[in-house]
């Protein structure tokens, strides 16, 4: 079995569960629990629209993953993820005896923050960027889904601003961990995406390295992960506190769900982070 471990992450394969953990966040394992759950035999798709069989399997998969990392799966809260820039502060769970999945209160929401213990913030992806944030000083966490639309709307910056306004977090204290996602090597787009990206980020110093014309094609490669890193540093995060797993979901589609590879019927991975 391929091992994706590197200087920033460890790849755990245990009891039929595969997940990634960030070495930096493991330094605070007495305060937080976290993981990025993966594996093509697991599917963290939580929408009821896919039927009870898919939903019940997802609940079981969440239970298995959460058990491995010391979280009660009932603590999970997940936004509806509609490619918005909206962040919601979770002050308490809505359902005491079951998962807070796809709640009306989390519609038009793609990121969550909290300073409460035993609330496990969850997001899912199949190529989109997921970012887990942690302020060890204020003891605040966030979990953000940033697809290409979310990145264009700077949702990661919105999360930092929400942490500042709600909990007085100092950006220099915030750690941001970037989960597996599609990378520049495979994120190739047409002008309908390239043009708004260039217009939004044209002032970035390295824009010509972040948006690159594909030779002999009417397409462009965009480094959405690189853009997130730069705009997070612009709002005060330290370079050493932005931890990238460096893993492309398409390049590693034998282990990680990828919409571009799986197409219809694609599965989802999940990022989970909880304050103890």
Where does each model-flagged region fall?
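Active-site microenvironment for binding and transforming phosphate-containing groups
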Residues: 1-276
């Amino acid at each position: 079995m391929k091992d994706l471990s590197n200087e920033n992450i460890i790849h755990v394969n245990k009891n039929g569960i595969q997940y990634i953990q960030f070495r930096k966040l493991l330094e605070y394992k007495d305060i937080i629990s976290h993981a990025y759950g993966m594996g093509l035999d697991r599917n963290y798709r939580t929408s009821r629209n896919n039927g009870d069989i898919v939903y019940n399997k997802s609940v079981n998969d969440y239970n298995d993953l959460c058990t491995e990392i010391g979280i009660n799966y009932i603590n999970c809260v997940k936004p509806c993820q509609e490619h918005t820039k909206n962040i919601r502060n979770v002050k308490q769970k809505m359902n005491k005896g079951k998962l807070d999945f796809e709640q009306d209160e989390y519609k038009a929401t793609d990121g969550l923050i909290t300073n409460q213990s035993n609330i496990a913030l969850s997001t899912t992806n199949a190529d989109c960027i997921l970012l887990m944030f942690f302020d060890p000083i204020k003891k605040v966490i966030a979990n953000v889904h940033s697809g290409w639309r979310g990145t264009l709307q700077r949702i990661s910056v919105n999360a930092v601003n929400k942490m500042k306004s709600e909990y007085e977090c100092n950006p220099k204290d915030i750690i941001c961990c970037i989960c597996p996602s599609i990378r520049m090597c495979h994120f190739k787009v047409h002008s309908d995406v390239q043009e708004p990206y260039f217009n939004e980020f044209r002032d970035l110093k390295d824009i010509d390295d972040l948006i690159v014309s594909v030779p002999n094609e009417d397409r462009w490669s965009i480094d959405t992960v690189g853009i997130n890193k730069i705009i997070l540093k612009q709002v005060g995060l330290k370079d050493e506190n932005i931890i990238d797993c460096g893993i492309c979901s398409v390049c590693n589609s034998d282990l990680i769900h990828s919409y571009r590879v799986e197409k219809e019927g694609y599965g989802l991975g999940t990022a989970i982070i909880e304050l103890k």
